[in-house]
């Protein structure tokens, strides 16, 4: 292993816009944010419109020379391309520019390697990196061996990726075996949770939309949050109290981004399953972001890929205090500011109202002999009105379909 370099890398960004490219400007803005998240200093960027990518060097020969001059003049150490490069393009660009060249996918994988905290998260990132690198290692070992550390070559934790092509397939097999064991245990825990009467809520959204802030607001506990991309990788599930004795579970997991590498979606499938096996998906959107509609589409596309579109949803437009003249595009929705003083009470009420729409209304009469059963009912139902007539208490409220059997305990 080569020691990871600590110095800040000076990077130059390159993007090519084809006639059918969507949201190109947004994609380039994100590339800059990704580079900064990875710890780089972005010195400049270059964009070009073309009918198609150059099969050898991605950009045309004339523009390639302009980039080379910029690299030399600004002492650039790394060029980051806003597209997935072929192994051939990668080699040719490095030979022409004389510096390390990585693409958007490799940059995202690198950030995931930095962010991974749990054993499972590190395994998932390592697997995604190896799957990405494998076709680039075959016949391209020399190119990759020249990458003397830094952005694009970091592995989970402190060490760098092992770029020995002879062992990569064995590493992939070994990691997949380890992840199967982890997933078996996760599946057991998930199965118990599915059998539980507790209502399950999952947070989903674009990276940096504020999911962890909402998690912290509702739990009054510390979940790492920051104004940066991919602050959270590992799925976190916590119990929260919404009203009276009513408890639910709340799961936060990795955020999405445009052009999320397929290797990551595949490797993190078990983690993303945590948000799939819920009763309600809360889609968090940054209302203050001018590109929020594009972010919505990206998340919905990935949800479709993961077969999650049929799960009941609530859209939370977060950071509403920073959004002027905002018009929601998804329903049902609620405008919130997760960092406002009253945010917890507001969020609790918003969730309860959405749950009422999904639950079954009920009214029961409770005789004194069965009053002791009310406590258990309060743990799974939203209690509305309670009235006493003589010794009989009439309770109305809402309860999930899967828990309606609990009402039978009160019937004669």
What are these regions (language model features)?
Residues 1-110:
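N-terminal accessory targeting/assembly segments
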Residues 2-3, 26-29, 52-68, 234, ...:
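Switch II of P-loop NTPase G domains
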Residues 17-21, 50-52, 84-87, 106-109, ...:
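Conserved nucleotide-binding/hydrolysis micro-motifs of P-loop NTPases
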Residues 18-22, 54-57, 115-119, 160, ...:
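Flexible beta-alpha connector loops of hexameric P-loop NTPases
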Residues 30-34, 68-71, 85-95, 245-246, ...:
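Conserved C-terminal guanine-recognition region of P-loop GTPase G domains, centered on the G4
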Residues 99-149, 156, 309-314, 319-368:
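Canonical P-loop GTPase G-domain recognition
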Residues 146-262, 275-276:
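Conserved G1/Walker A P-loop phosphate-binding module
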Residues 358-412:
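NTP-binding/hydrolysis catalytic cores, primarily Walker-type P-loop NTPases
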């Amino acid at each position: 292993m080569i020691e990871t370099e600590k110095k800040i890398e000076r990077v130059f960004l390159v993007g090519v816009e084809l006639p059918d490219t969507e949201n190109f400007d947004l994609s380039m803005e994100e590339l800059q944010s990704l580079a900064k998240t990875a710890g780089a200093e972005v010195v400049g960027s270059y964009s070009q419109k073309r009918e198609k990518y150059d099969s050898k060097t991605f950009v045309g020969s004339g523009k390639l020379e302009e980039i080379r001059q910029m690299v030399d003049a600004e002492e650039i150490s790394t060029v980051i391309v806003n597209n997935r490069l072929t192994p051939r393009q990668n080699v040719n660009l490095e030979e022409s520019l004389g510096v390390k060249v990585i693409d958007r996918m490799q940059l995202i994988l690198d950030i995931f390697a930095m962010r991974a905290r749990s054993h499972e998260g590190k395994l998932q990132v390592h697997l995604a990196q190896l799957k990405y690198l494998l076709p680039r290692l075959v016949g391209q070992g020399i190119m990759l061996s020249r990458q003397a550390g830094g952005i694009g070559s970091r592995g989970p934790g402190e060490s760098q990726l092992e770029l020995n092509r002879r062992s990569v397939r064995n590493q992939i097999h070994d990691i997949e075996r380890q992840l199967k064991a982890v997933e078996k245990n996760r599946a057991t825990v998930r199965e118990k949770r599915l059998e539980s009467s507790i209502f399950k809520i999952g947070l989903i959204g674009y990276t940096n939309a504020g999911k962890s802030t909402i998690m912290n607001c509702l739990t009054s506990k510390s979940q790492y949050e920051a104004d940066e991309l991919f602050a959270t990788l590992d799925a976190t599930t916590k119990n929260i109290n919404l009203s009276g004795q009513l408890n639910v579970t709340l799961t936060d997991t990795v955020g999405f981004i445009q052009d999320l590498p397929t290797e990551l979606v595949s490797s993190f499938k078990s983690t993303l399953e945590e948000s799939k096996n819920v009763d309600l998906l809360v889609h968090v959107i940054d209302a203050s972001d001018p590109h929020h509609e594009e972010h919505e589409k990206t998340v919905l596309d990935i949800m479709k890929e993961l077969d999650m579109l049929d799960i009941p949803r609530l859209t939370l437009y977060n950071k509403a205090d920073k959004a002027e003249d905002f018009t929601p595009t998804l329903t049902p929705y609620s405008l919130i500011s997760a960092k406002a003083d009253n945010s917890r009470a507001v969020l609790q009420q918003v969730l309860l109202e959405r749950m009422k729409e999904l639950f079954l209304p009920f009214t029961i009469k409770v005789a004194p002999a069965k009053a002791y059963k009310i406590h258990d009912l309060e743990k799974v139902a939203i209690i509305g009105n309670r009235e006493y007539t003589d010794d009989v208490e009439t309770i109305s409220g809402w309860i999930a379909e899967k828990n309606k059997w609990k009402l039978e305990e009160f019937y004669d």
